[in-house]
From Swiss-Prot:
The keyword Phosphoprotein does not apply. This is Retinaldehyde-binding protein 1. The modification N-acetylserine is found at residue 2. It comes from Bos taurus. The gene is RLBP1. 11-cis-retinal binds at residues 180, 202. Residues 136-297 form the CRAL-TRIO domain. InterPro entries: CRAL-TRIO_dom (IPR001251), CRAL-TRIO_dom_sf (IPR036865), CRAL/TRIO_N_dom (IPR011074), CRAL/TRIO_N_dom_sf (IPR036273).
Amino acid sequence: MSEGAGTFRMVPEEEQELRAQLERLTTKDHGPVFGPCSQLPRHTLQKAKDELNEKEETREEAVRELQELVQAEAASGQELAVAVAERVQGKDSAFFLRFIRARKFHVGRAYELLRGYVNFRLQYPELFDSLSPEAVRCTVEAGYPGVLSTRDKYGRVVMLFNIENWDSEEITFDEILQAYCVILEKLLENEETQINGFCIIENFKGFTMQQAAGLRPSDLRKMVDMLQDSFPARFKAIHFIYQPWYFTTTYNVVKPFLKSKLLQRVFVHGEDLSSFYQEFDEDILPSDFGGTLPKYDGKAVAEQLFGPRDQTENTAF
């Protein structure tokens, strides 16, 4: 946890001022996407208080309660509960705090999310065998997925996926999901990201019928499982742009797997990006995602995530 998190008390007048500031934020009001958060912005602390029920005086207590709940549940001998306790052994307070924030400081729900986090790894071991930054680096360099180096005006991390040039014989669906898993773990080390969350932009321009036919329902279910109750991440929105008419067939396969909360956060724009631009400023988006910046550069982002190639740590998650 960063040293700057919650180191002062605010009077109501200050809180009202910060709430007003939250209504008029720009991308410049937020910290970097990559690397740790050295100090949370004051307006982000207020957001955590208002949206996540976070208070400085109860933060440590909530972490302790979750740690105790993990051990109490494991004592029952239930298989998944034991696996959870084994998985979190040696984890610091910052690790537990991610789950508590993701469930708005409700310790019981945070524990259920922790169970989901461990269960996802048990359910899909093929995604986590020998998983490391080096193992997914080539996939990230190819842009599957991408990450904007600037937060959006709401402070969210923006993840990108451009399906047009994706060849499933060169990069498999599982390899893409592995890259997502590594990136999420890495970016969730940042407290600002824990509070503000993520959004995803999926560019389906050039999506072919052959690609659509190659997407198995089991793969799509695996992707949805990753987004729902398997990471201590707040997924705030998923935006689809430039999708062809037959995208509906693929989407209809996915929809039954989506819980109502996530389904309400899916936006399908097509060619009309007017509402899309109300959410995202063009000057933070690459040209291949409807913006004014140069085309997305996956190699540059991989270096920001993992460092130069010769310094990449081969540390399994």
